[in-house]
Amino acid sequence: MSAAPAPSPWQPAPMELRASSEQVDVWRCDLQRVGDEAGLLRWLSPLEQGRAEEYRVASKRREFIVGRSMMRLVLAKLTGREPLDVSFAYEPKGKPQLDASCNTGEITFNLSHSRGMIVMATAARRAVGIDVECVRGRLSFEKL
């Protein structure tokens, strides 16, 4: 008999999404739980689809496709738009932000991914940042 999985501290997304300046919402996606990413390509713009094709490593291409789809789907819900109608502007170093034309709620977001886990933070009228890193085994402090 196998042990039951531990309960998750993560809650399912509410039916209605609303960004708030009083809280930061964190979204996560475990790539192992995502089926074929080919179906997600429909949520990407032609430019994003082209970028996806440039990835030579399949796992990196998958992270990009799933991450961009997640970003578009969450932001579409928050802005009341269709996913493909969500448009982005880019900071000088390439960080995406919502284009002013579709960001009446002053929504901010940040996305990070590492080794099969994607996380996204959203809020309104405040800067947000998020980072996820895969920890590789334990360090032996004696060896340092």
Name each model feature, range by range.
Residues 1-144:
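Core catalytic alpha/beta fold that binds nucleotide/phospho-ligands
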